[in-house]
Amino acid sequence: MLRFKELYQQEIIENLQKEFSYKNKHAIPQIKKVVINMGVGEAIADSKVINNAVNDLTLISGQKPVVTLARKSIATFKLRENMKIGCKVTLRKDRMYDFLERLVIVALPRVKEFRGFSYKSFDGKGNFTFGLKEQIVFPEINYDKIDTIRGMDITIVTSAKTDKESKFLLSGFNFPFYNNF
């Protein structure tokens, strides 16, 4: 079994129960899914770039991503409707916990000048979104085999009703936050 899943079931649930005194065990917040999005603006000029982004995201997430398409044409960016402009993957259950474990333990310590996340990244409904500027912080990515450094957006969707509950939940998973709530 995964360490983060065991950590949630054995410790975090109890801590949340004590802190917020839930009456129903189903009201205790949990992480529902993790969405990783990689926008590839260069794909407008070179369609092969999207394949490299898909390969990188497959290595990082362990799951094949979906290619995202442009919803409407924008002449300024030379963008046409239904052009491939990125890829995303939604992780749930065991793959989600596996990714979060690799993110917190391996990837985040490798980010340059990283001091922690800001509480401003919460959306007011308990979801947490942040961006990484380089995909090479993940050990699955070989620096010599990538064509260019790309960033990604990561959204952690929780069942928490407030940002405070969500912050407490993510702090239980050792997410580094740098300012007070």
Curated annotation (Swiss-Prot):
- The name this protein carries in UniProt is Large ribosomal subunit protein uL5
Q: Write out the similarity annotation.
A: Belongs to the universal ribosomal protein uL5 family.
Give one GO biological process term: translation
Tell me where on the tree of life, at the top rank, the source sits.
Answer: Bacteria
Q: Listed GO molecular functions? A: rRNA binding; structural constituent of ribosome; tRNA binding
SUPFAM superfamilies per record: RL5-like
**Subunit and partners:** Part of the 50S ribosomal subunit; part of the 5S rRNA/L5/L18/L25 subcomplex. Contacts the 5S rRNA and the P site tRNA. Forms a bridge to the 30S subunit in the 70S ribosome.
Q: Which InterPro entries match?
A: Ribosomal_uL5, Ribosomal_uL5_bac-type, Ribosomal_uL5_C, Ribosomal_uL5_CS, Ribosomal_uL5_dom_sf, Ribosomal_uL5_N
Q: Which PROSITE patterns match?
A: RIBOSOMAL_L5
Q: Which UniProt keywords apply?
A: Ribonucleoprotein, Ribosomal protein, RNA-binding, rRNA-binding, tRNA-binding
Q: Does the keyword Oxidoreductase apply?
A: no
Protein function: This is one of the proteins that bind and probably mediate the attachment of the 5S RNA into the large ribosomal subunit, where it forms part of the central protuberance. In the 70S ribosome it contacts protein S13 of the 30S subunit (bridge B1b), connecting the 2 subunits; this bridge is implicated in subunit movement. Contacts the P site tRNA; the 5S rRNA and some of its associated proteins might help stabilize positioning of ribosome-bound tRNAs.
Gene3D superfamilies per record: 3.30.1440.10
